[in-house]
């Protein structure tokens, strides 16, 4: 993924990073980011190789079961190797996030470390920089999640549903004007029970927001290559699929074209009569290209949801769990991943109000 940053960042973005950041040499074997501990900087790997791994689960039965199922070991499982051009820091521009993986130098490496405080300030003040970095982050995180699934096995797809309710985050982050544009640019359509909205392995042509009803996500059990699966429908055959999640109102599907991800490996189907708002891929792509403030908000949403998806897999398998359970003693100095802050509760109210406003706007049009 070394070309992502060069492709997505501008010359002024790179100049600012070089001026603000500090080059650091990392000895082979040294831990750069430790799972569950705060990150103070964004790291760009300039030279060398980094290893991304999961710490050993604390006797979690689900983690043991999946490790056995996929034929792997539980201790310090390798999930990715990063080369020059990759970026790590687990979205350091979100101060409530703790790393879900450990990153250490596999060989002697050189990184550019950009302090979190300066980065957060830059993201607020420079919309163009924010749009570029959030998009690059989303692309890299999408690739990282794909690597995790490939390393741990496709059985982990069932665990990859974000812990953040998408409706709560998406509609809290977007502006009223953004939502108004989505309504105007999109088309509301009814998806009858049993209708496939997105076929796994096939190109995605629109971003879909579920307004009413329920959709299922199903993974194909066909082990043929993606091209063979994509054209199998021409032969009139259907490959067996296994449902692993259900979507409800406010959830989105179809974001893969905007982060240069391959066509999704799962299919999306209506399990009851449903209504969706569909924004054509070409219209949204044009909007993202010409409206930088909107692009910054949109790609930030995708980056956070992808990071949360990665955390969902790791946490569900029991790797470095930092969530609070009933009857557990609370450590006031510890941050728990399922702890509800006052800011989060305020976001919930705001997101709900905006989603209801969007529904009313659609009904009037």
Where are these regions (language model features)?
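Cytosolic regulatory regions built on CNB/CRP/Popeye-like sensor folds
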Residues: 1-365
């Amino acid at each position: 993924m070394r070309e992502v940053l060069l492709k997505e960042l501008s010359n002024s973005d790179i100049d600012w990073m070089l001026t603000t950041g500090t080059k650091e040499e990392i000895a082979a074997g040294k831990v750069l980011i430790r799972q569950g501990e705060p990150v103070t900087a964004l790291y760009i790997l300039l030279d060398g190789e980094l290893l991304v791994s999961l710490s050993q689960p604390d006797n979690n039965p689900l983690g043991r079961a999946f490790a056995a199922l996929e034929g792997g070991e539980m201790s310090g499982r390798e999930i990715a190797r990063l080369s020059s051009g990759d970026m790590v820091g687990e979205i350091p521009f979100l101060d409530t996030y703790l790393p879900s993986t450990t990153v250490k130098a596999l060989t002697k490496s050189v990184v550019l470390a950009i302090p979190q405080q300066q980065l957060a300030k830059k993201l607020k003040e420079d919309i163009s920089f924010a749009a570029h970095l959030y998009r690059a982050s989303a692309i890299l995180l999408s690739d990282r999640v794909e690597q995790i699934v490939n390393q741990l096995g496709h059985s982990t797809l069932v665990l990859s549903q974000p812990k953040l309710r998408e409706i709560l985050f998406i509609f809290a982050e977007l502006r009223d004007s953004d939502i108004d544009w989505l309504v105007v640019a999109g088309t509301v359509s009814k998806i009858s029970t049993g209708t496939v909205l997105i076929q796994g392995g096939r190109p995605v042509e629109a971003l879909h927001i579920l307004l009413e009803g329920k959709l299922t996500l199903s993974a194909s059990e066909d082990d043929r290559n993606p091209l063979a699966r994509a054209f199998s429908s021409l032969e009139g055959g259907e490959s067996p699929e296994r449902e692993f999640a259900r979507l409800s109102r406010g959830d989105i599907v179809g974001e893969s074209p905007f982060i240069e991800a391959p066509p999704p490996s799962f299919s999306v189907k209506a399990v009851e009569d449903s209504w969706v708002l569909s924004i054509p891929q070409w219209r949204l792509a044009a909007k993202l290209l010409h409206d930088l403030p909107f692009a910054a908000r949109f790609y930030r949403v995708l980056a956070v949801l992808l990071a949360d998806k990665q955390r969902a897999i790791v946490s569900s398998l029991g790797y470095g769990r930092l969530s609070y359970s009933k009857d557990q003693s609370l450590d006031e100095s510890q941050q728990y991943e399922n702890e509800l802050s006052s800011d989060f509760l305020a976001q919930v109210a705001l997101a709900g109000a905006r989603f209801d406003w969007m529904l009313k706007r659609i009904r009037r049009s």
